[in-house]
Design a protein with these regions (language model features):
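Core subunits and conserved enzymes of cellular information-processing
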Residues: 3-242
């Protein structure tokens, strides 16, 4: 009887150990999956922004604002995107009413490859000749750039490991003030870049990266993010919301 009881205890212990190992492996698999999703979203975001900049038929508004302000100043596009990111991080801290170092570090980590890749991809796309395509195809590609950006935002907002500060701002506004309404949140977040573009135009009487794609982004980007939340990786839900 004692041997049978000890045997049962031993089997239960082994089962618990096996269950723990399996759970750990599942967690690791989940993290690998999230990492793949994150890399996919980063590439979508960089390619989408680079497309809109290269085609000059209208960028997403934050990128368009960076293009116009960099034209007014001697600052490169990559550096201007980085500066915008820092200013938005400060805004996010004010809205959250706290300094979340993990969140801020994540913002900076995201900005480095994003700013660099957009600055690199844009001239590469110009060099392959996409600006020589018929106007209709260029318009389609420009709108596709905005769609790619929306896909990217949807994915990495749900992962919520690290976000571009502008998309972190949109997520904060979306869930803090608008009960998850991505369309309203995006319109509010677009106000600062619109003001920056107006100021740039007043100084130079020139305007860049503003066109049909910008209008498309203004009208549809927020709504597209909400749509892609449901249809792109639908098993991926919003994580770690405050």
């Amino acid at each position: 009887m004692r041997l049978e009881f000890c045997d049962i205890i031993d089997r239960v212990s082994k089962w618990e150990e096996g269950f723990f190992v399996q759970a750990t492996q599942n967690k690791e698999l989940s993290n690998v999956r999230l990492l793949i999703y994150f890399i996919v979203s980063l590439m979508f975001n960089c390619l989408g922004n680079a497309l809109t900049v290269a085609l000059n038929l209208g960028s997403a508004l934050w990128t368009a604002a960076a293009v116009n302000i960099s034209d007014v100043t001697p600052v490169s596009l990559s550096m201007m995107l980085f500066i915008f990111g820092v200013l938005i991080i400060i805004t996010n801290v004010i809205l959250l009413n706290k300094i979340d170092l993990k969140r801020i570090i994540g913002n900076f980590i995201f900005m480095v490859p994003f700013s660099t890749l957009v600055g690199v991809f844009s001239p590469l796309l110009i060099n392959v000749g996409i600006t020589s395509l018929p106007l209709f195809l260029r318009i389609v590609l420009d709108c596709m750039g905005v769609v790619f950006i929306s896909v990217a935002i949807s994915i990495y907002q749900r992962i919520n490991w690290m976000l571009h500060p502008a998309d972190d701002l949109m997520q904060i506004v979306r869930f803090k003030f608008f009960k998850g309404n991505s369309s309203l949140a995006q319109l509010v977040v677009f106000m600062p870049p619109i003001i920056a573009i107006i100021v740039s135009y007043a100084l130079t009487h020139q305007i860049y990266a503003i066109n049909i794609g910008t209008v498309f982004a203004l009208l549809f980007q927020g709504g597209l993010v909400g749509v892609f939340d449901k249809i792109v990786f639908p098993d991926l839900k919003h994580r770690n919301l405050e």
